[in-house]
Structures are given as C-alpha cells and as structure tokens.
Amino acid sequence: MRRTVLLVTVLLVFIGGCLGQMENPRPTNNPSTSHPSDSYSTLPTTKYDVLKEGQEKPVVNAINSFTFDLYKELAGNNNNVFFSPFSIETALAMAYEGARGKTAEEMKRVLHLPEDDDARWTGFRYLLLSLKSPEGSPFILRSVNALWVQRGYSLREEYLGIVKEFYLGEAKEVDFQGNPAEAAREINEWVEEQTNGRIKDIVSGLSPLTRLVITNAVYFKANWSSRFRASDTRNETFHAPNGTVIVPMMHQTGEFPYFENDDLQALELPYEGERLGMLIILPKEGKFEKVEGNLSAGSIENILKNMREEKVKVALPKFRFEASYKLRDVLMDMGMKRAFLVPDFSGISNGENLAIEDVVHKSFISVAENGTEAAAATAVTLTMNAPMQEKEPKIFKADHPFIFFIYDRETGTILFMGRMMNPKDG
C-alpha cells in the first residue's frame, strides 16, 4: 500500500464595478480594448521561453516571502491551517498587472513582486510551464488560470495579452449581469473539473455588478518515494492544544534529509520523481510558539541547506481536511487597502471603475494510504561480516502540532503551507 498526498487549492478574485472613489487613472501606452474571444487564441512562443539560470528567482523569492506574511495572519488561533501561497500570489499578480498608481504600489509591496516587468513576467511564465507535470510523470501537478469576463465587457488588449502569454490564462465570457446564477455554475464546473471533483460550489451569490472573476486552481497528487506500509499503521495518541486524541499513526525507518537544533526537528519526505518534497517542522516540547514566530523564507532556506541524510525512525499521522478563507480583510490588514476601497484598475479596462470585491481561497489536503502494491519481491543475500558500530536512528515522532510545506525542490518555490494542530479536525 502506498501513502498518497492529494492537494487541491482554488483562488478566486472577484472584481466588480465600483461606485465609490477611484484614484486618478494613469494613462496607458496601449488604450486598445478587446473582447476575450477576439484575441490571443493561441499561446505564443516568445523570447521569455529562452531559459536563463535563475530567471525564476525574483518570483520565487516573492512567493516565499508572501507565504510567511500571510501565514502569520491566518494562524491566529489553534486551528489547522492549509493554503497555497503559489495559488494566491499567482491570481493576485494577474490582478496586479491591471493595477495602476498607488493601488499597484500597495499590491507590489504586499506581494513582494519584482519591480522589473520582464523579471516578473519571465518568472511566472517559467514557473507555470516548469511546474506542470509532464506526460508519464510519477506525480500529477497542474496550475491553471482563467479570466471570467462579463459578456460584451471590453478588456484592454494589452492586459489580455499579458495574462495569456505570461500567466498562461484563458479568458471566458459569462453573463454576470443577466444570469449570475448561470455564471456561477459555469465557474463552479470549471473549478470542479480542474480539481478532479475535490472542490465544489466555491462560487455562490455573484453580484450583477461583477465584471471579472480571476481564478487559479492547483491540483497535486503524488506518492512518497519511500512508502509507508499499511501493516505498520496503528492508533496512537496525538497531543493537540486542547487535549489528546487518538489518530492512525504511520511508521517507517529510512534514510531521509534531516536537521535538528535546540528548538526543532526538520524532516523532508520526497515524493516519487524527486521533484517535489514535503518539509515537516516539528517544534520540540514547549517551543512551538518560538519556532512559529521565527518562521521566514530565510529560516526555511537555512534549514534546507543544513539538512543531511540520516537514518530516521518516522511516525506521522494520517490527516485530511479542507480550509476556506475569505482574504479581503486579511489582505487589507497586510497593507493592500486601495485595491478594495479606492482602486485604480484602469490597466484592465477603459470602462467602469473596478474594485476587488473579495478574494476567496479554498484548499483540500488528504494524506492517506491507498492503492495496491501487487506481486513484488526483493531478495538480498547477506553474508556475515565483522560487526560494525551502527548509529542509532533519529526519532521523529510527529505526535504533537507541526508545520509542513510542499515545495518544488528544483526552484525552491513553496507551493503549499500548513499547520497541523489536530488531525481529528477535518
């Protein structure tokens, strides 16, 4: 039996007509407008596909820095946390491409986006192309973007081109004004299809004032490189903040990247294909708040650099839960106020004043045993040799709250971040 991780995340940015104030719009160099169906029907090959070492780094650094800023906002209680900073950053970056003036300045600062257009465009295009699992890959990973536009509403041709070329996003026309229920159904069907049915009915009650919905969906499914045997799973105690609970605990002993200091243990479990891995940060007794408070892109990078292959005896709970967040207030608290209150999205359209109505993020994770391993055997012949002093394996027992990341080992991009406080809380 294999242990499979299934991760799904969806982000929706609702942009509607704004009846309030708006910044004085900055003129754009290209005032032409277009309906989504009129332009960019095929994905062009551009100079941005010429690979350069490190070209994705500015965007990776932005995503990883944003990860910890957002985590601090979401982790204000003892609940489980799970979100995709990659998904959220990507969708908001698409909105940023149409922001102007102080609205753009605030968004750039909160999202840590590169100042240089080419660096931003190159980085996102590279990541979105690079992170798509190829045919025959041992894991499934896809990130897809779409713009849902009010039928007949004109978007700037320049904006449509940027989203199509650099964010690989497709534009679809719906009728928010005349039939918002049908528009919601179409978006929900798309989300359900892109997430293999894991996330349903994410949109409801759309306003007739809605002009644009920006969506990003990320889906990931993989097996561990080193499998847990179902026969080794047993019910054990997990020490949650509000008391102990009994959970199924997985066990195995193997060679894994490992790091330890006075405050924490860190373990990496690679997935099949070795491209992606789960990094688990397990604070030592009484150190959770200290470890959590010190988390940053730099501290995680330092842990990864100092990991060494060690023999580790691993105990990890099975868990499965959904998380749903409305991020409007969170993003405003982080400093992104103008996008909601006094916006300038004149780079998206020449028409009505546009404002972000809300940002909705929904995610799902399942870490469980499934599938079958049939008729496989390995024979190893051993001969007696002089006894050697064998090091005792490190003990990594995740029977109390821990923090985890799913990240791309090639670029260092954090795709998902979570906090497991109680595996029983689904």
Curated annotation (Swiss-Prot):
Gene Ontology terms, MF aspect: serine-type endopeptidase inhibitor activity
Region (Disordered): 23-42
Xref: InterPro entries: Serpin_CS, Serpin_dom, Serpin_fam, Serpin_sf, Serpin_sf_1, Serpin_sf_2
Record site: Reactive bond: 385-386
SS bonds (residue pairs): none
Pfam family, one: Serpin
Keyword Disulfide bond: no
Protein name (Swiss-Prot/TrEMBL): Uncharacterized serpin-like protein TK1782
Transferase is among the record's keywords: no
Transmembrane segments: none
Keyword annotations: Protease inhibitor, Serine protease inhibitor
Family classification: Belongs to the serpin family.
One GO CC term, this protein: extracellular space
Polar residues bias (residue ranges): 26-42
